[in-house]
């Protein structure tokens, strides 16, 4: 594959991608803002920079054949809209332009299923060719849609080929930064998650499957194309049941209805902002949980050889990893 450079290596998907590239023996450079012990012992090169600082990208991308762009901000609580836009949109534009200037052959961009407007009546959703932020809700979805369209439009310019992969809700190991799902697992471990949620469902995918799909996209993805990288859709209640079972915990007896969640969400949003903690429930996330999540991965299976693991295995691996990670932090 030649020289690979990747952004977002400290993230949930990014770290899994780094391990996948190294396991395949790829010459890999990671773009990071500062040193981190999570890279200790890994055979990768480091370039220091930031996607919102374009002058740092050209030096990092020099001589690269493939760039994987997974850096981004997933923000559920309100108040950080400018940061989200700057990283997700401007940062992606900076990456694209640096790829062109440096003669990069292929860019693989990590988009999201959130860029899709939900279809009614649980209709199956397949890949689309145009992404419009104005018909979406939430700053994350809007910024990822705008960035995705920019990457599509960049395909074929200045010798650059672009491929986009679009994961659903990511689970699995390597949750160093504590995602919303990871926060829930940590609360279950501590016995601080007292309720079973009686509404909503979502589509989940393991970060290791996303990483494999990203590499496959670089190797055989069609230029200018998007690929939905999703797994199983299960109810939130089933997710909690599988998580508690994986950790040997009892399933909570208290039930949280959508009505109660709707009532509590505005209060919780203030709490998350004041305490600067990872949000579990916001008004936006509740709406997402009750919207259509019936995504098809048929195209990725056919063209990329995508074959995701079961959600139960992924949840178990995530729970085991978080349990070990938190225990080691206390030593």
What are these regions (language model features)?
Residues 133-135, 185-205, 209:
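A conserved pocket-lining segment of Rossmann-fold NAD(P)-dependent short-chain dehydrogenase/reductase
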Residues 94, 179-180, 197-218, 225:
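Substrate-positioning beta->alpha
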Residues 136-163:
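Active-site Tyr-X1-5-Lys
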Residues 158-160, 172-183, 217-227, 249-251:
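Glycine/proline-rich active-site loop of Rossmann-fold NAD(P)-dependent oxidoreductases
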Residues 213-279, 297, 302, 310-331:
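Mid/C-terminal beta-alpha module of Rossmann-like enzyme folds, strongest
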Residues 36-40, 44-90, 98-101:
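NAD(P)H-binding glycine-rich loop region in Rossmannoid oxidoreductase-like domains
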Residues 90-140:
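Conserved Rossmann-fold NAD(P)-dependent oxidoreductase catalytic core, especially the SDR/UDP-sugar
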Residues 4-24:
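N-terminal Rossmann NAD(P)H-binding glycine-rich loop of SDR-like oxidoreductase domains
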């Amino acid at each position: 594959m030649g020289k690979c450079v990747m952004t977002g290596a400290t993230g949930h998907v990014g770290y899994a991608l780094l391990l996948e590239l190294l396991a395949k023996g790829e010459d890999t450079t990671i773009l990071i803002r500062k040193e981190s012990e999570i890279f200790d012992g890994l055979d990768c090169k480091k370039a220091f920079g930031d996607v919102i600082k374009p002058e740092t990208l050209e030096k990092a991308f020099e001589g690269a054949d493939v760039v994987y762009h997974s850096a981004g901000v997933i923000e559920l609580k309100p108040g950080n809209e400018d940061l989200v836009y700057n990283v997700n949109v401007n940062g992606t534009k900076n990456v694209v332009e640096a790829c062109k200037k440096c003669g990069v052959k292929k860019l693989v961009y990590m988009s999201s299923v959130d860029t899709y407007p939900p279809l009614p009546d649980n209709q199956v959703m397949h890949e689309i060719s145009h992404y419009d932020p104005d018909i979406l809700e939430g700053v994350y979805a809007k910024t990822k849609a705008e960035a995705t369209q920019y990457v599509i439009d960049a395909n074929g310019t200045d010798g650059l080929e672009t491929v986009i992969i679009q994961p659903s809700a990511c689970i699995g190991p390597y949750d160093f930064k504590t995602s919303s799902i990871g926060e829930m697992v940590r609360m279950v471990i501590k016995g601080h998650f007292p309720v079973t949620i009686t509404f909503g469902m979502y589509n989940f995918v393991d970060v290791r499957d996303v990483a494999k799909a990203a590499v496959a996209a670089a190797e055989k993805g069609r230029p200018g194309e998007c690929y939905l990288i999703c797994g199983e859709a299960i109810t939130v209640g089933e997710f909690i049941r599988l998580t508690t079972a994986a950790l040997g915990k009892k399933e909570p007896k208290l039930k949280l209805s959508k009505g109660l969640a709707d009532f509590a969400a505005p209060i919780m949003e203030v709490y998350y902002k004041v305490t600067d903690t990872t949000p579990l429930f916001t008004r936006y996330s509740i709406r997402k949980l009750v919207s259509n999540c019936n995504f098809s991965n048929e195209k990725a299976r056919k063209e990329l050889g995508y074959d995701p693991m079961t959600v139960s295995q992924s949840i178990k691996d995530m729970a085991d990893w978080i349990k070990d990670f938190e225990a080691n932090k206390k030593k």
